[in-house]
């Protein structure tokens, strides 16, 4: 059953006591949970594997940072865009405004929501068809401060860790290094197994230790720019030497 919307006073109270986000960000966190509740009660639940930043921080790391996208890999390669958009049709507070499709993805680029703040806003809902899922997904609780009981079909943390390794090589984003470091701190993951998992997944371009270290240097020089864009519970640069040691200990040169 999809819950009714909370009022502004309750949003403010819960945010002040628990999240301490901006109110706009807190409302988005609330609608992320609602969108996943809609998914849980739909026919798509067992067809999509939840992954990415929102999955990490609501299933594995207890909201150590804010993440605003819903990312999935589809187990059903014949899934159509209408299969996805239809689950939101009967939900009064959601409106699908912009959809992009290709052989590689279905993206609801703007899943507009109408909340108590009366400010136009939207979520991004992205489904990947190219990236395979190697390990069996986990049935886990989506932790949230809003009191919703939500179960998700989420990617195994070992495979998420492997995807973060690839992401650090592909791009220079603080959030990737942040997630990789916190996962390595909280979970005793084997790096050899991680590299083997990377090799079993779709590799679109070579993954190299050199590019990871180069991207970390860029992130270190431009850290304030991204830190100011997204809420982070802690500053991993307080342990910058520990992160550099972790990255330099990566026991591979190139994966292709």
Model-based region annotation:
Residues 50-54:
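Glycine-rich beta-strand-to-loop/alpha-helix junction loops that act as flexible
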């Amino acid at each position: 059953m999809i819950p009714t919307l909370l009022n502004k006073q309750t949003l403010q109270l819960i945010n002040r006591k628990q999240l301490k986000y901006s109110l706009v960000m807190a409302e988005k966190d609330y609608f992320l949970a609602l969108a996943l509740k809609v998914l849980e009660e739909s026919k798509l639940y067992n067809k999509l594997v939840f992954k990415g930043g929102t999955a990490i921080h609501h299933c594995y790391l207890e909201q150590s940072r804010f993440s605003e996208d819903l990312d999935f890999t589809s187990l059903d390669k014949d899934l159509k865009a209408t299969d996805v958009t239809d689950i939101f049709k009967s939900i009064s507070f959601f409106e699908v405004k912009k959809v992009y499709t290709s052989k590689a993805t279905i993206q609801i680029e703007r899943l507009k929501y109408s909340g108590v703040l009366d400010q136009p806003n939207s979520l991004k809902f992205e489904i990947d068809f190219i990236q395979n899922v190697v390990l069996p997904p986990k049935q886990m609780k989506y932790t949230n401060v809003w009191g919703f009981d939500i179960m998700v079909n989420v990617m195994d943390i070992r495979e998420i860790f492997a995807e973060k390794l690839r992401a650090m090589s592909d791009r220079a984003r603080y959030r990737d290094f942040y997630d990789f470091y916190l996962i390595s701190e909280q979970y005793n993951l084997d790096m050899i197994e991680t590299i083997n998992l990377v090799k079993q997944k779709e590799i679109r371009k070579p993954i190299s230790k050199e590019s990871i270290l180069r991207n970390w240097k860029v992130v270190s020089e431009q850290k304030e720019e991204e830190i100011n864009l997204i809420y982070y519970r802690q500053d991993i640069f307080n342990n910058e030497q520990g992160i550099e040691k972790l990255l330099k200990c990566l026991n591979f040169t190139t994966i292709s």
